[in-house]
């Protein structure tokens, strides 16, 4: 164990440190964090508008409110790529101490420039009340419009790429003073607005070249290129439940050695969000969610189950402790754990570098995820409400799962919770018995010294 720990400290710790200091990873994390006021802001409306009770949904449709819920929620979910590209460019450029707001606006404009802006619709003259079966469309018309398929989850990868390209160009040209020089008496607001005009021209010319260049390829645009060659393979891999369980297991493995799983979260989260919003789009359209297994594994195997380490089972096990040390730790860690904050328990036991807790800490995601997938098949769960992806990450698992899948998903929660306890209890019992012996020895020693 000592040799392995030294190897980790020599290899993974420097890598983790570099990744945490990396401007791209940091800006990427900040880009999604800055979207949280939007996603959390519509969380309540999302729950009301898509509450998983058919009678309620039918009622909203009958009084005409369903379309308004869809419109308000769509203003966030169907425009996520726009928000992310602005936030990324702002954060990245701001970290280099240049004007992040200007870079963010240039990034939005660049993203829109690269989008297909024409929708082809059929032209029908003398529209009858009913079309005969023999009717054919003999002509089409082009309508100028932006498609939400590109501004939403499908465009996230391109949004990040464009935000990064714009940021790099903006920073490099700013370093070379490729800006308009204005007299000293000009107000700062005017200077900030006019000085990057040349940089804007260069960036837009670059975007024009990218747009034209892709138009001559079989992909026709950068979005199809990204979807087919980048996004589809990556999401396909992560959507595999066994790969996802492996990633969560590796994250807990890092935690055991004191390395925060944010090391992989910055890379994984954009893919998970892309899949989550694809689920939301499908569900809102009345279709089955395309990434059902991902939702099931995430519900029980990620940090949405008592935080890192899946600590719900540990908290319940701690109620059996007779040790004063663990009784006090339970008071400190129980409530945070309910809301998926497990650090008080991880550091308080401690679980890190504690061989006793290696198995329950590291292998919970794989065990719970496998059982949940099996139970989902037995209970014939074929669709879930993905709107819970918009809820805060601190939402307790039973609340999230009840909204997402109703009674069948709550049954899975209950069974997995029992399993969670059974996995943690034997290891915790050894720990609290040892602590109890130490406390008794300390009391006896204190008594002998007093005598």
Curated annotation (Swiss-Prot):
<feature type="transmembrane region" description="Helical">
    <location>
        <begin position="239"/>
        <end position="259"/>
    </location>
</feature>
<feature type="transmembrane region" description="Helical">
    <location>
        <begin position="403"/>
        <end position="423"/>
    </location>
</feature>
<feature type="transmembrane region" description="Helical">
    <location>
        <begin position="104"/>
        <end position="124"/>
    </location>
</feature>
<feature type="transmembrane region" description="Helical">
    <location>
        <begin position="151"/>
        <end position="171"/>
    </location>
</feature>
<keyword id="KW-0472">Membrane</keyword>
<keyword id="KW-1003">Cell membrane</keyword>
<protein>
    <recommendedName>
        <fullName>PTS system galactose-specific EIIC component</fullName>
    </recommendedName>
</protein>
<feature type="transmembrane region" description="Helical">
    <location>
        <begin position="69"/>
        <end position="89"/>
    </location>
</feature>
<dbReference type="InterPro" id="IPR004796">
    <property type="entry name" value="PTS_IIC_cello"/>
</dbReference>
<feature type="transmembrane region" description="Helical">
    <location>
        <begin position="40"/>
        <end position="60"/>
    </location>
</feature>
<dbReference type="GO" id="GO:0009401">
    <property type="term" value="P:phosphoenolpyruvate-dependent sugar phosphotransferase system"/>
</dbReference>
<dbReference type="GO" id="GO:0005886">
    <property type="term" value="C:plasma membrane"/>
</dbReference>
<feature type="transmembrane region" description="Helical">
    <location>
        <begin position="263"/>
        <end position="283"/>
    </location>
</feature>
<dbReference type="InterPro" id="IPR051088">
    <property type="entry name" value="PTS_Sugar-EIIC/EIIB"/>
</dbReference>
<keyword id="KW-1133">Transmembrane helix</keyword>
<feature type="transmembrane region" description="Helical">
    <location>
        <begin position="332"/>
        <end position="352"/>
    </location>
</feature>
<keyword id="KW-0813">Transport</keyword>
<keyword id="KW-0812">Transmembrane</keyword>
<dbReference type="GO" id="GO:0008982">
    <property type="term" value="F:protein-N(PI)-phosphohistidine-sugar phosphotransferase activity"/>
</dbReference>
<keyword id="KW-0598">Phosphotransferase system</keyword>
<feature type="transmembrane region" description="Helical">
    <location>
        <begin position="190"/>
        <end position="210"/>
    </location>
</feature>
<feature type="transmembrane region" description="Helical">
    <location>
        <begin position="296"/>
        <end position="316"/>
    </location>
</feature>
<feature type="domain" description="PTS EIIC type-3">
    <location>
        <begin position="8"/>
        <end position="427"/>
    </location>
</feature>
<dbReference type="InterPro" id="IPR004501">
    <property type="entry name" value="PTS_EIIC_3"/>
</dbReference>
<dbReference type="GO" id="GO:1901264">
    <property type="term" value="P:carbohydrate derivative transport"/>
</dbReference>
<feature type="transmembrane region" description="Helical">
    <location>
        <begin position="356"/>
        <end position="376"/>
    </location>
</feature>
<dbReference type="InterPro" id="IPR003352">
    <property type="entry name" value="PTS_EIIC"/>
</dbReference>
<dbReference type="Pfam" id="PF02378">
    <property type="entry name" value="PTS_EIIC"/>
</dbReference>
<comment type="function">
    <text>The phosphoenolpyruvate-dependent sugar phosphotransferase system (PTS), a major carbohydrate active transport system, catalyzes the phosphorylation of incoming sugar substrates concomitant with their translocation across the cell membrane. Involved in galactose transport with PtcA and PtcB.</text>
</comment>
<keyword id="KW-0762">Sugar transport</keyword>
């Amino acid at each position: 164990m000592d040799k392995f720990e030294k190897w980790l400290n020599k290899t993974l710790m420097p890598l983790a440190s570099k990744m945490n200091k990396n401007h791209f990873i940091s800006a990427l994390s900040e880009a999604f964090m800055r979207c949280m006021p939007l996603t959390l802001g519509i969380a309540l409306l999302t729950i009301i508008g898509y509450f998983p009770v058919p009678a309620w949904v039918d009622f909203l449709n009958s009084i005409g409110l369903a379309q308004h819920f869809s419109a308000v929620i769509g203003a966030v979910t169907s425009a996520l790529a726009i928000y992310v590209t602005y936030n990324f460019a702002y954060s990245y450029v701001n970290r280099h101490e240049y004007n992040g707001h200007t870079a963010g606006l240039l990034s939005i404009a660049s993203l829109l420039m690269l989008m297909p802006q024409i929708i082809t619709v059929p032209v029908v003259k003398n529209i009858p009340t009913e079309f005969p079966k023999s009717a054919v469309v003999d002509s089409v018309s082009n309508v100028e419009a932006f498609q939400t398929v590109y501004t939403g989850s499908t465009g996230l990868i391109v949004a990040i790429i464009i935000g990064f390209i714009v940021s790099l160009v903006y920073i490099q040209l700013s370093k070379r003073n490729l800006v308009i020089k204005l007299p000293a008496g000009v107000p700062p607001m005017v200077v900030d607005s006019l000085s990057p005009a040349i940089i804007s021209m260069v960036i837009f010319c670059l975007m024009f070249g990218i747009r034209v260049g892709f138009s001559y390829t079989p992909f026709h645009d950068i979005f199809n290129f990204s979807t087919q060659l980048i996004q589809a393979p990556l999401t396909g891999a992560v959507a595999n439940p066994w790969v996802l369980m492996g990633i969560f297991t590796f994250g807990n493995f890092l935690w055991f050695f004191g390395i925060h799983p944010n090391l992989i979260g910055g890379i994984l989260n954009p893919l998970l969000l892309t899949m989550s919003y694809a689920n939301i789009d499908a569900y809102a359209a009345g279709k089955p969610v395309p990434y059902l297994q991902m939702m099931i594994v995430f519900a029980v195997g990620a940090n949405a189950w008592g935080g890192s380490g899946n600590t719900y089972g540990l908290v319940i096990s701690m109620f059996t402790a007779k040790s004063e040390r663990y009784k006090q730790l339970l008071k400190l860690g129980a409530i945070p754990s309910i809301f998926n904050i497990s650090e008080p328990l991880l550091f308080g036991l401690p679980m890190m570098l504690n061989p006793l807790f290696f198995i329950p800490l590291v292998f919970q995601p794989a065990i719970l995820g496998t059982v949940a997938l099996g139970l989902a098949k037995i209970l014939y769960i074929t669709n879930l409400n993905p709107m819970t992806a918009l809820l805060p990450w601190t939402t307790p698992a039973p609340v999230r799962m009840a909204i997402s899948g109703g009674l069948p998903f709550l049954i899975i929660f209950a069974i997995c919770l029992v399993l969670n306890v059974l996995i943690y209890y034997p290891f915790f019992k050894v720990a609290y018995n040892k602590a109890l012996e130490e406390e008794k020895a300390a009391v006896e020693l204190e008594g002998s010294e007093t005598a």
